[in-house]
Amino acid sequence: MLWTEIMSGQFEKAVERSKGVCVMVVGCVEQHGHHLPLGQDVIHTAGIVELAAKKEPVVIFPHMYFGEKQGAGEFPGTIIFSTRLMLDILAESCSEMARNGFKKIILVNGHGGNTNLLNTFARSVLHEKNDYLVFVYNSWSAWPRINQMLKIIDSGNKKAFPELTDEDIEYLRYYLKNNKNSGHGDIMETAMTLGLRPDLVDMSKVNEVDGTSTHYISHLAKAGFYTPFDWMSSYPNSYASDAHEGNNERIGRTLLNYTVQRTAEAFKMIKEDTLCEAYLNTWLEKQK
């Protein structure tokens, strides 16, 4: 259920139907190679969330396109907000969800760079002693693993993935064997968008820029250091992937269907959970 499509007079019923669970997709507007749109993180994550919500009803708050992308302004179209503003937007958004009756809020993260930001925000809610819970769910937690899919196929259960042709399966074997770089604009992200919005993907440009790591300062990471340039210096084209020109809509729909089901199961888990709510209530009592 999209928040913006619910009539005001039906809102209380929507809260009841969702068991007080509201979901907000948090992404980023940035380059993902030359073959994917700038809004990739929200586009594919929101598509998954909306399909999952049809299986396991939750209310979906307007998406937050603006994520952590400091220092990447050289790519046209990138949108960069200050960290303070993003934290304020998250706080105000969650406050409004709670005011409207939602006591369980799931922030579905579609951008790897948001992970620390969202985890920090979730803990910051405790400082205000709010009576609602914030859960952070990284969207890629629900993605299938190609090696797991191939094991299922090799066990004689090819029917589990009815859309895949023999050529698709062989391509996935080839990619799994030869893949060295992934994580941004890669086979998985591209497949999700091919499954949802193939009109937004230009596979003729998938190899236009290099997606391999430069390992520019990887020696510092290996020594235990974090620097704000780790990822940017390793992937200066804002693309982290080996070539995956064999990717297609069939593979995309197959991966998408699995991900939607896993995401729906995650929503169900939070709807049915009572332990976190009980812990929060006990904790709030101790703070008085």
Stretches with model-predicted labels:
Residues 1-84, 88-104, 112-288:
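Extended, histidine- and acidic-residue-enriched regions that form the cofactor-binding/catalytic faces
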